[in-house]
UniProtKB/Swiss-Prot annotation:
InterPro entries: SurE, SurE-like_Pase/nucleotidase, SurE-like_sf. This is 5'-nucleotidase SurE. NCBIfam families: surE. The lineage of its organism: Bacteria, Thermotogati, Deinococcota, Deinococci, Thermales. It comes from Thermus thermophilus (strain ATCC 27634 / DSM 579 / HB8). The keyword Nucleotide-binding applies. It is found in: Cytoplasm. Keywords: Cytoplasm, Hydrolase, Metal-binding, Nucleotide-binding, Plasmid. Nucleotidase that shows phosphatase activity on nucleoside 5'-monophosphates.
Amino acid sequence: MRILVTNDDGIYSPGLWALAEAASQFGEVFVAAPDTEQSAAGHAITIAHPVRAYPHPSPLHAPHFPAYRVRGTPADCVALGLHLFGPVDLVLSGVNLGSNLGHEIWHSGTVAAAKQGYLFGLSAAAFSVPLNGEVPDFAGLRPWLLRTLETLLRLERPFLVNVNLPLRPKGFLWTRQSVRAYEGVVIPGEDPMGRPFYWFAPRPLKEAEEGTDRWAVAQGFVSATPLRLDLTDETRLQPTLAHD
C-alpha cells in the first residue's frame, strides 16, 4: 500500500511525523506538507501563482520518508504529492494540533486535505488532537493511531473519515458530526503604532449531544466520523417541486 501523508500545521509539526510513522506500519509512506502553518485554510487551492516544492529531510530519530516541503495549501500538497510521488492508495492528514469537531470541518485545512484525496477517488482520513495547554504525547497516542488505522482499512473503499483523538483515549466510537453553533466574539486591540487589529475568538453556544464527535472526545473516546461530499438538501428535492 502507498500512503501520502500531509497536514495543515506545516512540515515541522510533530503530529505530521507521528502519523507518518504510524502509517509506515501499513505501507510505503510519502510526505508532502506546507512549508508554513496553514491552519483554517479550508479547501483553498493556489491558482494566482506557481506552487513550489522542495525536498525535505525527515526529523532526527525518525524513520526516513521521501518528503517535500510545499509552498502551498494543504489541498495543494495532496494534488502535488500525487504528481511528485505517483499514485497512492490512501491519503492521511494530521495529526492536527487542535481538534476538528462539528462545524470546524468547514474551515479545517486538515480535513480539506483528506477531502482533496477523496475527490481524486482515494480513501482518506483526517486526524486531530485537542490543544488545551498540554503538549500531546504522540508516543502514548501511537497505539491508538495504529488501532484506528487498522479499523479504517477494513472499511469499504473509498472512504472519507474525520478522526479526533483525546489526549488520553479510553476507547473508540463511530460518531456523527456535531452541530457546533458559535458566538462570534471579536476582540479588538491596538499595535505599538496605534493601528487597530482584531482577534476572532468564537465560543460554542451549547453542549454537545450524545453520540456526536464533540461528545465522544469530551468523554475520552477516539471519535471517527464518516463524511460525504454531496451537500444536496434531499428534503427540498420533492417530486412536486416546480421548475422555473
